Amino acid sequence: MNAFLHAISFFTRIPVPWLRPSEEAWRKSVNWYPAVGLVIGLLLWGVHQAGLVLFSPWIAAILTLIAWVYVTGGLHMDGWMDLADGLGSSRPREQILAIMKDSRVGAMGVLAAIMLLLIKAGAVAELAHPGWGSFLIVAPVAARTHVLLSIKLWPYLSADKGIGKGISSGLSVSSIIVSYIIVFAAGWYLGGLQVMTAIFLSLLFALWFSRSVAKKLGGLNGDCYGAVIESSEAVVLLVLVGSWWL
């Protein structure tokens, strides 16, 4: 449970006053990423449902996106922007990594954030009808399950000393397997074939994205993990929007 509290404390703005700091619990907190996604998803679902009662679907979607960024502290979005700045520079590997470490945000990072938020907002607005509330639970959970594979399958950048270093040692294969069993079972229960398709295609995307970035950089780091989460969430939403015919 302490590992779960570490994950909640670091990856959300939710206060955890009873947290007991522990390096071992921090390493094992990676196994609880999908559970953190569930907490985030339930909060977003509540905001979205309240927004739909009071406002139009688009206003509800915008409020949901604001809550999405706020509850995560913009941590994963920061990784998405840093990676966009680095890869968008079209520089050699070492310069890309230097750009990603720079605390300043460049034009490519800003554009990438705007495009991602527009995609998410548009998808949330399109999915604002009865019976589809579960998508706001599925997207954060699926994305944080997919990133476990990114952490496990590709090496961490050896020269990087960021917060993601060392967490792979605490990640167990059994946690990944159990997480996927739960995610797919819950997906089937919540939305049948449409949600299952969204989870599966976002998994394929996350693997492709991770492989492409790792090939370019020689590994992955915390920024890359954040980018995997953000982009996988968007893919889940887009597939759900386009899967009405299933």
Curated annotation (Swiss-Prot):
BP terms from Gene Ontology: cobalamin biosynthetic process
Subcellular locations according to the entry: Cell membrane
Q: Gene symbol?
A: cobS
Protein name per UniProt: Adenosylcobinamide-GDP ribazoletransferase
Keyword Transport (UniProt) = no
What biological function has been recorded for the protein in this entry?
Joins adenosylcobinamide-GDP and alpha-ribazole to generate adenosylcobalamin (Ado-cobalamin). Also synthesizes adenosylcobalamin 5'-phosphate from adenosylcobinamide-GDP and alpha-ribazole 5'-phosphate.
Q: How does it sit in the membrane?
A: Multi-pass membrane protein
Any one GO MF term held by the record is: adenosylcobinamide-GDP ribazoletransferase activity
EC code: 2.7.8.26
Note the superkingdom of the native organism. Bacteria
Instruction: Name the cofactor(s).
Output: Mg(2+)
Which key words tag this protein in UniProt?
Cell membrane, Cobalamin biosynthesis, Magnesium, Membrane, Transferase, Transmembrane, Transmembrane helix
Q: Which organism is it from?
A: Brevibacillus brevis (strain 47 / JCM 6285 / NBRC 100599)
Lineage here is:
Bacteria, Bacillati, Bacillota, Bacilli, Bacillales
Q: What Pfam families does the annotation carry?
A: CobS
Q: What is its main location?
A: membrane
For this record, an example GO cellular component is:
plasma membrane
Q: Which cysteines are joined by disulfide bonds?
A: none
As its record notes, the protein acts as a catalyst of:
alpha-ribazole + adenosylcob(III)inamide-GDP = adenosylcob(III)alamin + GMP + H(+); alpha-ribazole 5'-phosphate + adenosylcob(III)inamide-GDP = adenosylcob(III)alamin 5'-phosphate + GMP + H(+)
Q: Where are the transmembrane segments?
A: 30-50, 51-71, 105-125, 131-151, 167-189, 193-210, 226-246
